[in-house]
């Protein structure tokens, strides 16, 4: 995660790493590969130490149909708090802007030319990488188009900084970004990309490297680059840690759901009871967190300080329309305990996406109900959500939600 969240539309599903790999061919032909943490239902674009940690509450169990799920079409009701006045979100589009949900006010983001095809956002430490979408046609459906300009928008910035040209962009390990280029017309499923690490000011942070053919950078870590196959084959979907200077291949991970510069979280294949595995790359310490029975992890995102992992839990049910109850929960990396985010027990068709807000410790989610679209914000330890309602025609169509 990720995320550009637009009002309306069909929900995409599936864990984080496969979203990247599966979308690569389309993203390259459109120009840049977008890094999503976690996944939103719309693919046009993608905190600090918490003041307190709520005591773990009871975990809701799976229901038949939508029993126990937030009432629709009214959305989240009951006791809520006003949206924090200083909490703003970027909005994508032909002219990206800052959006203040508390008041509905918008402010322009300087330094960006108008782009009819819109912009894509990639979350990085301290801000976002931005790149124009493109409708350029290439020789084949999965071939790379011409590289395009990458910009950096700081969390507190009012304008962008130009970084360089690339086909793909991914966050680095220490406040940097990785820019990857392919020859125009090359097929990234078989070609090797050339990547260079740059600072948020656009200065080179090292020599360029040639990636293994058929692999793409998901993010930089303290132990090398986390790579994903551009076109994974059934039964071989695995990410790998890769150090260009190391003679031996790095470790592989199947079912990655989230990654930061210092941690990787994944869910091994499971049947009755799933467990999230977390590897601390700095210490080598593994951690196992059990999930509630009859649940699976749909998406996840680490907080900026790495102390919390937000997860979207999906619960089994017998709903005729395929929608399932979901709930947002936080995993404390210090204790391994789960804490339910209050008032987020909703239908999977309602939860558009979620992520950590920039420059703060709040978890933000967008929820689309029949008659309204709501933004929810929650600081760990708070007893209730802060809610803002998005008004059609008065709110941006595509919001970038956190990490």
Identify the residue ranges that each predicted region occupies:
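Loop/turn-rich, solvent-exposed surfaces of beta-rich toroidal or solenoidal domains
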Residues: 297-329, 346-355, 365
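Surface-exposed loop/turn elements that mediate protein-protein interactions on large endomembrane-trafficking
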Residues: 50-75, 92-115, 134-165, 185-215, ...
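C-terminal region of N-terminal signal peptides and the immediate post-cleavage residues
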Residues: 14, 31-59
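Blade-terminus and WD-like Trp-Asp/Gly-His loop motifs, strongest in beta-propeller folds
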Residues: 75-85, 119-129, 168-178, 217-226, ...
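Terminal targeting segments of Actinobacterial cell-envelope proteins
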Residues: 1-17, 27
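Hydrophobic membrane-insertion alpha-helices, especially the h-region
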Residues: 22-34
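Residue-level marker for isolated small/hydroxyl-bearing positions within beta-strands
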Residues: 90, 131, 180, 228-229, ...
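Extracytoplasmic intrinsically disordered, low-complexity "stalk/linker" and propeptide segments
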Residues: 85-87, 101
């Amino acid at each position: 995660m990720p995320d550009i969240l637009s009002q309306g539309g069909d929900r995409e599903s599936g864990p984080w790493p496969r979203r990247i790999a599966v979308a690569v061919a389309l993203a390259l032909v459109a120009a840049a590969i977008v890094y999503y943490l976690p996944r939103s239902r719309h693919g046009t674009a993608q905190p600090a130490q918490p003041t307190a940690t709520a005591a773990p509450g009871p975990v809701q169990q799976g229901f038949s149909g939508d029993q126990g799920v937030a009432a629709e079409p009214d959305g989240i009701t009951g006791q809520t708090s006003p949206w924090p006045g200083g909490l703003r979100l970027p909005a994508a589009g032909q002219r990206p802007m800052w959006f203040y949900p508390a008041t509905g006010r918008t402010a322009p983001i300087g330094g960006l030319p108008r782009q009819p095809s819109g912009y894509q956002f990639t979350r990085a430490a301290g801000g976002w990488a931005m790149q124009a979408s493109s409708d350029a046609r290439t020789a084949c459906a999965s071939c790379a188009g011409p590289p395009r300009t990458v910009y950096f928008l700081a969390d507190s910035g009012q304008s962008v900084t130009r970084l360089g040209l690339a086909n793909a962009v991914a966050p680095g390990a220490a406040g940097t970004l990785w820019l990857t280029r392919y020859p125009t017309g090359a097929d990234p499923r078989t070609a090797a990309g050339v990547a260079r690490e740059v600072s948020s000011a656009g200065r080179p942070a090292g020599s360029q490297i040639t990636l293994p053919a058929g692999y793409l950078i998901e993010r930089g870590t303290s132990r090398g680059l986390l790579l994903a196959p551009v076109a994974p084959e059934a039964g071989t979907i695995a990410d790998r840690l890769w150090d260009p200077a190391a003679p031996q291949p790095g470790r592989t991970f199947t079912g990655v759901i989230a990654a930061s510069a210092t941690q990787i979280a994944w869910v091994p294949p499971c049947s009755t009871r799933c467990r999230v595995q977390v590897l601390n790359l700095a210490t080598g310490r593994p951690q196992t967190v059990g999930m509630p029975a009859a649940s699976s992890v749909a998406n996840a995102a680490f907080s900026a300080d790495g102390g919390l992992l937000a997860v979207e839990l999906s619960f089994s049910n017998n709903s005729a329309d395929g929608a399932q109850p979901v709930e947002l929960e936080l995993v404390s990396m210090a204790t391994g305990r789960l804490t339910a985010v209050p008032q987020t027990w909703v239908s999977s068709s309602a939860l558009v996406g979620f992520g950590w807000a920039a420059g703060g410790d709040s978890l933000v989610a967008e929820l689309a109900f029949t008659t309204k679209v709501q933004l929810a914000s929650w600081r760990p330890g708070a007893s209730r959500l802060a809610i803002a309602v998005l008004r059609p025609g008065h709110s941006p169509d595509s919001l970038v939600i956190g990490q």
